[in-house]
């Protein structure tokens, strides 16, 4: 049975984990790190870089480097590079493809199945887009799981039979969730969830960038926001400063040659940022986490004192101000320190993959829908069929009627959100039920059914009870991709994977050829410069010289076939040279051995060959 992995597809970093003997293991990437930056870059030579290599070259390739694309999932965002438009799904798929490759390399087998996590507060369009990204990357997405639920699963499975209430506070690079869960006897049940899809560590970084821009403008009069390269350097410095301030009271931000003045003199940026100042400029961001926390406590119908454990998830929770706020809001409860906030979500996803594959037994995951679902009814009102925090999968039906006499059709508009007026919520999709027989208003019976699957993806059916006629919609308009577009993107991704493989193979062939040329050239030179002259005839060396020259010519070109052929020829000539040297050495030793037998001084010959495999033969010959 093929293995399934768990993937935390993050805004700033992503992680992949797999079950090994029933235990989850976080897989290190090809660079040796357990987290992979969610950064994709298109190099000017056509190569696509993903992860740390992409992040490393961001300053010199600003316009062709894409980060934090998770914030655009489920929207019509796209970016154009070399005349081709890329959607958020395609960019995310690049990160997923790298994680898939790294996991395959670790396991030594192909991977097709995955559980991918999303913020609990992701709407239907964002979930659908995440699933599409997985498909483009060549993955069969077994399940879309909420990040806090995955974290609770990873945290809570070994906590015994006693039922416990766990609060998961998840502040990542671009999204924020807070969820309340109950765990006991192998059941993980989400009681309530809330959050903000546009709040995360990136926002803290931007505040530091703005602070630096203002400071530099005040001292030099130059506005760095007009310089893309300078802004990229500022973002990287801001992220580094934020991380340092989690363990230090102050940090130095020193960026030499950040720009030049009117006289083309280089200017330096050198600022000292204290933790107190950092907390002052980001206080309002921190305060935005309070309302979702209070909503969850209210929706779950519990008091703060009922919380048994607090789990912090996401790298941004390492900021001291965040953990202090959580402690304050939970009545002084210390957050659990035994969980790695960067890895726990991927670990939970791997466990859920194990549950779905039958590798992990006796675990039941009961997740919830984060937002209410309903349709627009007369007067533009949002009529909710499924309330937020309803356990999924779920199915609800309600009967509606027509608003006008002899109305031949009804338009069903599906919305997600908490506002009373439908247009203030997110329109997920719409469809029409036609062919309703003429009748006075209020007579036709139209049954509308909402069905949410375990991934949190919505299906809606409208049925005329009188005629039995029905129409169904699977909500996917929000992601902006049709099946044809997804199929095209999958083919594109596969083509690029072949290109990448080809490029790697070409690089390997070049490296092998260059190494062979260098070693052979060195060998020939040593022979010619040897004391007493070369042991082999000059015509053998000349043949090798010719093969070296051919290999160098091939390496100067772009034809990999020619390089392979030249390398093969050079390999053959090198072997002939090695054979000639071996035979010459043997002949020399044989002559030396004969002389040694005559005068009784053969010890030096034996010393020369003491480590060689031919020693015993040599002694037998004597």
Swiss-Prot record:
Gene3D superfamilies listed in its UniProt record:
1.20.1270.10, 3.30.420.40, Actin, Chain A, domain 4 (3.90.640.10), Substrate Binding Domain Of DNAk, Chain A, domain 1 (2.60.34.10)
What are the start and end residues of every segment in region (Disordered)? Answer: 494-513, 588-622
InterPro entries named in the record: ATPase_NBD, Chaperone_DnaK, Heat_shock_70_CS, HSP70_C_sf, HSP70_peptide-bd_sf, Hsp_70_fam
Give GO terms: molecular function aspect only: ATP binding; ATP-dependent protein folding chaperone; unfolded protein binding
The record's section on PROSITE patterns has: HSP70_1, HSP70_2, HSP70_3
**Protein's UniProt keywords contain Nucleotide-binding:** yes
- The reply on keyword Phosphoprotein is yes
User: Pfam families of this UniProt entry?
Assistant: HSP70
Where are the Phosphothreonine residues found in this chain?
A: 175
Q: Which family does it belong to?
A: Belongs to the heat shock protein 70 family.
Alphabetical list of NCBIfam families matching this protein: PRK00290.1, prok_dnaK
Purpose of the protein:
Acts as a chaperone.
Q: What is this protein called?
A: Chaperone protein DnaK
Provide the organism lineage as a comma list. Bacteria, Bacillati, Actinomycetota, Actinomycetes, Mycobacteriales
Q: Which gene encodes it?
A: dnaK
């Amino acid at each position: 049975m093929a293995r399934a992995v768990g993937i935390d597809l993050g805004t700033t970093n992503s992680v992949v984990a797999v079950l090994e003997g029933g235990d989850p293991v976080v897989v290190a990437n090809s660079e040796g790190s357990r987290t992979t930056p969610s950064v994709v870059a298109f190099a000017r030579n056509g190569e696509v870089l993903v992860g740390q290599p992409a992040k490393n070259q961001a300053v010199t390739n600003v316009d062709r480097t894409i980060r934090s694309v998770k914030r655009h999932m489920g929207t019509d965002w796209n970016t154009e590079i070399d005349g081709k438009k890329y959607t958020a799904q395609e960019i995310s798929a690049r990160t997923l493809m790298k994680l898939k490759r790294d996991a395959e390399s670790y396991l030594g087998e192909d991977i097709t199945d995955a559980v991918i996590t999303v913020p609990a507060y992701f709407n239907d369009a964002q979930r659908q887009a995440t699933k599409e990204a997985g498909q483009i990357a060549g993955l069969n997405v077994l399940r879309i799981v909420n990040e806090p639920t995955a974290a609770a699963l990873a945290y809570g499975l070994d906590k015994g039979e006693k039922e416990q209430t766990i609060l998961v506070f998840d502040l990542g690079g671009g999204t924020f969730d807070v969820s309340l869960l109950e765990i006991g006897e192998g059941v993980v049940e989400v009681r309530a969830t809330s959050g903000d899809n546009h709040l995360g560590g990136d926002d803290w970084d931007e505040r530091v960038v703005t602070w630096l821009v203002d400071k530099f403008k005040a001292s030099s009069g130059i506005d760095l926001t007009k310089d893309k390269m300078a802004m990229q350097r500022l973002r990287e410095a801001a992220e580094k400063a934020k991380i340092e301030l989690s363990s230090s009271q102050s940090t130095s931000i020193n960026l030499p040659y950040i720009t030049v003045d009117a006289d083309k003199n280089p200017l330096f940026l050198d600022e000292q940022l204290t933790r107190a100042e950092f907390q002052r400029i980001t206080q309002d961001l921190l305060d935005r986490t309070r309302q979702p926390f209070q909503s969850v406590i209210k929706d779950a119908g519990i008091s703060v004192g009922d919380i048994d454990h607090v789990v912090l998830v996401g790298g941004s929770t390492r900021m001291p101000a965040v953990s202090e706020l959580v402690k304050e809001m939970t009545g002084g409860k210390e957050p659990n320190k035994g969980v790695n906030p960067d890895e726990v979500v991927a670990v939970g996803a791997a466990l859920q993959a194990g549950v779905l594959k039958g590798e992990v037994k006796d675990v039941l995951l009961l997740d919830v829908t984060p937002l209410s679902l309903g349709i627009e009814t007369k007067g533009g009102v949002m009529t909710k069929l499924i309330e937020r925090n309803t356990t999924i999968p779920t199915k609800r039906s309600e009967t509606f009627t027509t608003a006008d006499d002899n109305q031949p059709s009804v338009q069903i508009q599906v919305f997600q959100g908490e506002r009373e007026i439908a247009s203030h919520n997110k329109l997920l999709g719409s469809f029409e039920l036609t062919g309703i027989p003429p009748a006075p208003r209020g007579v036709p019976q139209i049954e509308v059914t909402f069905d949410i699957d375990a991934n949190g993806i919505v299906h809606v059916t409208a049925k005329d009870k009188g005629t039995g006629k029905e129409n169904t919609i699977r909500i996917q308009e929000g992601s902006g991709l049709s099946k044809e577009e997804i199929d095209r993107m999958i083919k594109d991704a596969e083509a690029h994977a072949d290109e990448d493989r080809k490029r790697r193979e070409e690089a390997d062939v070049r490296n092998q050829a260059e190494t062979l040329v260098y070693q052979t050239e060195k060998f020939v030179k040593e022979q010619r410069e040897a004391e007493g002259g070369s042991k082999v005839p000059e015509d053998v060396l000349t043949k090798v010289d010719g093969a070296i020259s051919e290999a160098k010519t091939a390496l100067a070109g772009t034809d990999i076939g020619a390089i392979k052929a030249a390398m093969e020829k050079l390999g053959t000539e090198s072997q002939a040279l090695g054979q000639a040297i071996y035979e010459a050495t043997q002949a020399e030793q044989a002559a030396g051995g004969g002389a040694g037998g005559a005068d009784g001084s053969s010890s030096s010959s034996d010393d020369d060959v003491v480590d060689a495999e031919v020693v015993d033969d040599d002694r037998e010959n004597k």
